[in-house]
Amino acid sequence: MLTRLSLVLLCLVTNMLMAQQATVTQLLSKDLTNLPNKEGLMITVEYAPGGSDPIHRHNAHAFVYVLEGSVVMQVKGGKEITLTPGQSFYEGPADVHVVSRNASNVKPAKFVVLFVKDKGAPVLAPAR
């Protein structure tokens, strides 16, 4: 009986964690011919209620613009801020993004990110 209950709880927790992961959609990728070896990448990020991302960095310039809901952002050494639709946020190439989450546990959140990054480089880099 205890094993069956443990299995049920494990399944529930796994489903909850999977539901909270961000959905990322690529909108555009473009070589920036006036900036040698650089490209622009535009994505949308959608957080389910209570959703968040782990600590990360981008090794790129990242310009964030909130479309729906509210998101909480913080880079290492900076203050935690809550952004609402129409507000923006910037991350530099050396910034470690320590907080990135939906501010709500009941409403989804969505934002656009424009990256200026090294051509062919991955969007995410390990946090240092």
Predicted segment positions?
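N-terminal targeting signals for Sec/Tat export/insertion, comprising classic cleavable signal peptides
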Residues: 28-61
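Extracellular/periplasmic catalytic domains that process cell-envelope and extracellular macromolecules
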Residues: 36-37, 57, 65, 82, ...
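Histidine-centered metal-chelating micro-motifs
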Residues: 52-54, 72, 89, 93-102
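A short, N-terminal "cap"/entry segment at the start of jelly-roll beta-barrel domains
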Residues: 2-11, 15-41, 74, 89-90, ...
